[in-house]
Design a protein with these regions (language model features):
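Long, well-ordered, tryptophan-enriched scaffold segments
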Residues: 185-271
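Residues at the starts of beta-strands that form the adenosine-phosphate
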Residues: 149, 178-180, 212
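Cofactor-binding active-site loop characterized by glycine-rich and histidine/acidic residues
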Residues: 6-10, 14, 18, 22-30, ...
Length: 272
């Protein structure tokens, strides 16, 4: 079994535990007032592969991570599997004294590097921490210390926040380095509509500030499917799918999604 296969097995455990944590909080655990607890299963599922790879393969001791708020169930699941979180805390997720809704350095017991919330502050903090790290290194306050990578796991809706763009400007002024922003572009937002063409607009913003931009869009199975007869039509359908249709089909489920793709691809074949 190679490393990728091992990571896939870990990923399944992390995803199951994260989803169970939310399900338990909403449907199993005693709820005296009957109010919905929430927990963001979709926002957790959309980044579980990336977080599994980071925490079980890529991160070094000197690296620091700002986890997007709506991925806290995945973070707590990873910490639990690593022996840094307790069963009691995850059973009481989003409850009094339990694992926090958003990763918190002051309220959580697991290994939170940067407290994050719903206003994008964790994103900007990675850039300023990196600038401070460079200042300390230049002044030689701590000699022979390896430089860490400051990593932000960013929900696409967090990029509505103005402080994110302020720190992009400051980073450009001061030759920012050793920073990764991994944007989970899942086309979902609780606070508004995700507009068409937003990904291209965001790409142009980062390019304007001289960031090294890498776009990961298609999975391995999709890339294999593109090589099959009609694969170019499938790729075009994915690229052209508007947000409204994408959201509706995700809600309807796999069979409806598959039928719509096949119906549309057949139309593409017969169109002049």
């Amino acid at each position: 079994m190679n490393d990728v296969d091992i990571l896939k097995k870990i990923e399944k455990k992390v995803l199951w535990l994260a989803c169970w944590m939310i399900h338990n909080a909403n449907h199993i655990r005693e709820n005296q007032d009957g109010l919905k607890v929430g927990g963001h299963q979709a926002s957790s599922a959309s980044i579980v592969s990336i977080m599994t790879a980071l925490y079980f393969s890529i991160l070094r001791p000197e690296d620091r991570v700002a986890v997007k708020p709506h991925a806290s169930p995945v973070f707590h699941a990873i910490q639990y599997l690593s022996g840094l979180q307790t069963k009691e805390k995850i059973e009481n997720f989003r409850g009094f004294g339990g694992a926090q809704s958003y990763p918190s350095r002051t309220k959580d017991i697991d290994d939170v590097d940067i407290s994050t919330g719903s206003v994008g502050l964790g994103v900007a903090m990675t850039s300023f921490i990196s600038l401070i790290q460079d200042y300390i290194a230049r002044k030689q306050f701590y000699k022979n210390k390896p430089l860490g990578r400051m990593i932000a796991l960013v929900g696409d809706a967090e990029l509505d926040e103005g402080n994110v763009y302020e720190c992009l400007q400051e980073g450009w002024k001061h030759d920012l380095r050793n920073v990764w922003w991994i944007i989970d572009y899942n086309r979902q937002s609780l606070d508004g509509v995700v507009h068409e063409g937003l990904s291209e607009r965001l790409s142009s913003v980062f390019s304007a500030f001289d960031w090294n931009l890498v776009v990961l869009k298609y999975g391995k199975l999709q890339e294999e499917a593109f090589k099959e007869p009609g694969g170019n039509k499938l790729k075009k359908w994915i690229d052209d799918c508007p947000n409204q249709l994408y959201s509706a089909l995700i809600f309807e489920g796999g069979e409806v999604f598959k039928k719509r793709i096949l119906d549309d691809i057949c139309l593409l074949y017969t169109s002049p």
